[in-house]
């Protein structure tokens, strides 16, 4: 299944998946209308989310609790490879990562971005709140300045110690 196919599917295209699952996947061309329809306030976060683990799920639930909707900007495969996470990363294709995220109750919408950072994507979404994990210095991120430029805010959420996809991959590879 190609990227456009997965991100462009709608309810009823695949009876094996609930309509709400596929409806959370959003291609960039549909983003403005889909964002407009979301309840406010909108919270936005981004990441690779290669092998989803407890730390990710806790973080996403915390992010959603800060607003009425949570939009996840997902690094495309090309974008993720540029982040230097190691050889063969991401392990899971962007389509699979997007579908896993969309299946989470806390996530309202998932969209891909190809750039190294989601700054351009933020201009489309214009969330009221941008969140990142506590392993980031939120004040130094360009995304923070962008969101604050239209009156939004940015916040770092506590990092859940002991959970890391990179560490998990290293452990598996021995």
Can you say where each PLM-predicted feature lies in the sequence?
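Nucleotidyltransferase catalytic core that binds NTPs
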Residues: 10-174
